Regions:
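Canonical positions in the second alpha-helix
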Residues: 10-11, 44-45, 79
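TPR/TPR-like (Sel1-like) alpha-helical repeat modules
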Residues: 69-88, 100
Length: 104
């Protein structure tokens, strides 16, 4: 995992706001158990490109794992709004299922 993290970080030096690379890096940090860095990169993605819908599901799941249910619910709600606006019903349904599992 560490080797992949280093490779992605090297790519990010050229384009630090690349959503795909930041998302990939966040997922690698999740695999490595580094939730603080994973969260930082998911949140960076949300700030850089709020329409990058994949971020919402994974950040929500991370927040659930660290016991921040209210924040996870808010992230799922925002993600559902974004997915609906993008007409991305697959992502919307995934976010809605995660939201309902947590909220009800």
């Amino acid at each position: 995992v560490t080797d992949r993290i280093e490779k992605i970080k090297a790519f990010l030096k050229d384009n630090p706001s690349d959503c795909f690379l930041n998302h990939a890096l966040a997922l690698e940090y999740v695999k490595a158990g580094d939730e603080a860095d994973a969260r930082a990169h998911f949140e960076l993605n949300m700030n850089n490109d709020p329409t990058y819908v994949a971020t919402y599901y994974h950040l929500g799941k991370l927040l659930e794992r660290v016991g921040e249910q209210e924040q996870a619910i808010a992230v799922y709600e925002k993600g559902m709004e974004r997915a609906k606006a993008a007409k991305d019903m697959h992502s919307y349904n995934e976010l809605q299922a995660a939201y309902e599992d947590l909220a009800y």
